[in-house]
Structure formats: C-alpha cells, structure tokens
C-alpha cells in the first residue's frame, strides 16, 4: 500500500524496528524465531502488539476486527431469543456479511452472503427465510451513526483490558487490548514470555524437534513449538505469545494480590473477570468477520 493511502486517511505508518531499541535484544530474536523458523505471523504479531502497547499505551485493535454491530439487529435478535436459537460462528458471520453488504450498497442476498445454508445456521429452510426477512427489515433503515463508538475506555493504571465475548465464559482474545503506557501488568507479561522462550532454548526445542522423554512440568506443553504448525494442534502459540499467556499472567496476579485460596479454580476467576465493573473485559468489538473467519487460531 502506498504512503498516500495512509496519509489521506490520517494514519501514521511507522517501522516496527524502533520498538526493539528500548527493550532487551531477546524480543527481536523471538520475533525472528517466529518469522524465519516457523513462518508464524500470528506469534510475531503477538510480540509486536505487546511491545507497542507497553511503549506507547492506548488501544490496539486487529485489522480484521470490526466495531460491535449486533445492536442493529433488533428484530432478528428478538426472534432468536424467542425461538431459543443458539448462534453459531456461521450465524454470527452471516449477520456481519449482511451488514457489510448493506454499507457497501451491494445486493443483500448475493451468492457471497448465501454461501452458508440453513443447516450451518442451525435452522430449517422456513426458519432461514424468516431470519433473512427480519435481517432485511432491521437493515432497511440502517445508518452509520447506529454503530456505537468505542468511546472512553477506562483501564486501571497498571493493568490492561482485553477483548472478550459474553457468550464465551472466561475466554479472552488479544485482538483488542487497551493499556496505559509502561503498565506493570504488560511488563510482567513480556517477562513471562521471555521465560517461556528461554525454557524452549534450554530444552533445545528451537532448532530441533522435541522428543518426549515422559518428564513433565507446567511448561512442558510448550516443547512442541517446532512442530505445532505441522501437526496443527495449535496449543503452543496462545500460551507462548497470545491471549493464553496474558490471561495466565492476570490469573497469577489475581491469586497473589488478593490472596485467593488455591481451591478456587482458575476458570472461575477468569469468568469473574468478565464483569464489566472490573474494566478488564472489552466487549465493544466483532471478531465474526470475513477475514477473522480465516484465522488459524479460531479453528
């Protein structure tokens, strides 16, 4: 993309290399590990976004994330609630596609939108026709000012706020992060990431494949780093650089700071953190987008 495209839209394009000037050389090494040895742009991006949010503060949003738009579907959402329909990922993506067709002034019921049939949406043919009719009604008087702005984001000074969805209890995403500059929580997350990469190096799992010797510890789950994208088990990246890493650090802080008894299971605390009053979970986003649907880490 040419610089002019960014300039006319008020974007400032910056080189990521300057992010590594003020931190340990380890992070540029980890970045190149992911790019060169694994071709893993997801982990490389995870590292960069944490460095950005730590050094600059503010709000980070993935390019394939859209604003929260489900509020525009008054009629269809009421119908879904009355009929007890469970919205699958396909259903939510379908609603997003319809919305995108509307704002681009394209034919609503094009082949691109009807790519998923009623079976994928969890309804029969009659129910599908009714849903299409209700969506058309909801979008008939749509205007861009109906999309809720992000508004002010309140984040505790040394914590961070993280993307989440109300329908997934205790689940978080790093597509949407907000933090003050030099947040202590982000610093601890980066330090923990460094410890995990060093564990991989110590066990010779960066340049060689892991051979299971039956000994296990808390970080043994990371040792298949080299083969993760080959076997497609996708269990390393989230806890090495992604949302799993962030949530595990937050849970550890919760246990320590509030002296929570170890009998309280982590998933209970993770669900509790989704309470809007705590300012940790961010819900004003939509990850059910055409580009987001292709993410390896959601499969």
Which role does the model predict for each range below?
Residues 1-46, 59-299:
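Glycosyltransferase-associated regions of secretory-pathway enzymes
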Residues 49-59:
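Active-site nucleotide-sugar/metal-binding loop of Leloir-type enzymes
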